[in-house]
A protein has these predicted regions:
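N-terminal FAD cofactor-binding segment of flavoenzymes
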Residues: 1-4
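Active-site-proximal substrate-binding core of FAD-dependent oxidoreductases
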Residues: 161-167, 340-342, 409-423
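A glycine-rich dinucleotide-binding beta-alpha-beta segment and adjacent secondary-structure elements
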Residues: 94-108, 266-274, 325-390
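C-terminal segments that line or cap access tunnels to active or ligand-binding sites in enzymes
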Residues: 232-347
């Protein structure tokens, strides 16, 4: 995509992220010319963190403590104890640029005020590889994976809810569904949230490390209010609203504090607007558009959690008022809609506390400190997905599968089927 995304502020200012160095420098200078030298230093910071944090760790197994210990000297040198916002604040003075350089961990469930500055690697990652979109939507990625499974002789059971993983003599033995069906297997891979895997699927098994108490003490990522809607006759309207738009509210640090530290649903908000149909018309009927608008909100683990059955229509109206500023008249064009709240994530995706991105990626909840891809609780049990290493977000989740491919023994596959999968 080009530009990658646009960030907007209430005062009408904006920042367009791009893969073009000159354009990026121009954007920085437009907001605050004095911050250009600091921005260039931040890019160097980002590259150093990319080398150790991405190339050295993301796709590598971290279930052995030594794998994390050996990078600690480099982490110390790079001041991984500082937050990504803290690093950005040391480099640039303009609060808008500080936000633009530090917000990325929000998209993997982390508070930029507290997650490690190692996540500054995203700037170099974007600069090197760009920002991409799978034509046809994320479903196309899932369908392609399913095609490989089936080509290798695998079966996929849909609308089948796992209720328990059976353990015998310290080894994973079988998966039992809620309808009583049982699937025996010498190896089991769980892509349920790690918290759900241990606290529910292994609830009858005595756990050594990932006990209910330990999981309860973890910091979980924020929840999400996600409003999906389609519109009629809007192709070509709101031309300044591209594929990815971030619309900031009046507060950055204060809003993050409410969400992550106080568990309070604020009246103000910052929104991410996704409009894939400007890139890929196939995802909407002719002449129409497909959108979703995402607002970070507290998860359900707080003492005074939000009652979303009551709050949803109220909050929808508040979100609509903000979207109206970007896309005047949009509500009259809506043809279909659905809304996900943290309760949806808890009920539909079995996510603890309705968290959108599983365990928050703080430094002591990352790498070896995160639930391991190789479970300690039972031989032959493996974990994949947002709750394990390397973490949440589409790149992280797919990378966790790459990590697992280095750990799970290969299953025998007929040569003809292997060839089909490769093709």
């Amino acid at each position: 995509l080009e530009p990658f995304y646009e960030i907007r502020w209430p005062d009408g200012s904006y920042f367009q992220a791009s893969g073009d160095d000159e354009k990026m420098q121009s954007e920085v200078q437009r907001l605050n010319p004095a911050d250009l030298p600091g921005y260039k230093r931040f890019l160097k910071d980002s590259q150093k963190r990319y080398i150790i944090g991405y190339e050295g760790m993301v796709a590598e197994p971290m279930h052995r403590l030594w794998e994390t210990l050996k990078v600690l000297p480099t982490f110390a040198m790079l001041r991984a104890d500082r937050s990504i916002y803290g690093l950005a604040a040391r480099r640039v003075k303009d609060e808008r640029l500080r936000m633009a350089l530090s917000f990325h961990p929000l998209f993997i469930g982390g508070d930029p005020m507290h997650v490690t500055s190692i996540y500054a690697l995203v700037a170099h990652l974007e600069k090197t590889y760009g920002v991409h979109y799978a034509m046809g939507g994320v479903q196309q990625i899932a369908d392609a994976m399913a095609a490989v499974v089936r080509a290798q002789g695998g079966q996929i059971h849909q609308n089948a809810v796992a209720d328990e993983i059976l353990i015998k003599n310290g080894a994973a033995q079988a998966v039992v569904l809620t309808d009583g069906q049982r699937f025996d297997a010498p190896l089991i891979v769980s892509n349920a949230d790690a918290g759900h895997t241990y606290d529910h699927l292994l609830r009858k098994h005595s756990r050594r490390r990932w006990t209910t108490g330990k999981l309860a003490r973890k910091r979980w990522s924020m929840g999400l209010f996600v409003w999906y809607f389609g519109t009629r006759g809007t192709a070509g309207r709101w031309a300044d609203v591209g594929h990815h738009t971030i619309a900031n509210g009046p507060r950055y640090k204060g809003l993050l504090r409410d969400i992550f530290l106080k568990g309070r649903l604020s009246d103000d908000m910052s929104l991410y607007i996704h409009r894939p149909s400007v890139t890929d018309p196939s995802v909407a009927p002719a002449g129409g558009d497909t959108f979703y608008v995402l607002s970070p909100v507290p998860h359900l683990g707080w003492k005074n959690k939000v009652d979303w059955q009551k709050e949803m229509p109220i909050y929808r109206a508040k979100v609509a008022a903000e979207v109206e500023k970007l896309m005047p008249g949009f509500e009259a064009c809506i043809s279909t809609e659905t809304i996900f709240t943290p309760e949806t994530f808890e009920d539909r995706y079995l996510s603890p506390h309705g968290a959108g991105f599983s365990i928050e990626p703080r430094i002591l909840q990352s790498a070896w400190f995160r639930p391991h891809n190789v479970s300690e609780e039972a031989r032959g049990l493996y974990l994949v997905g947002a709750g394990t290493h390397p973490g949440a977000g589409l790149p992280g989740v797919i990378s966790s599968a790459e990590v697992l491919s280095k750990l799970v023994p290969d299953a025998p596959v007929a040569q003809s089927k292997t060839r089909m999968a490769a093709e």
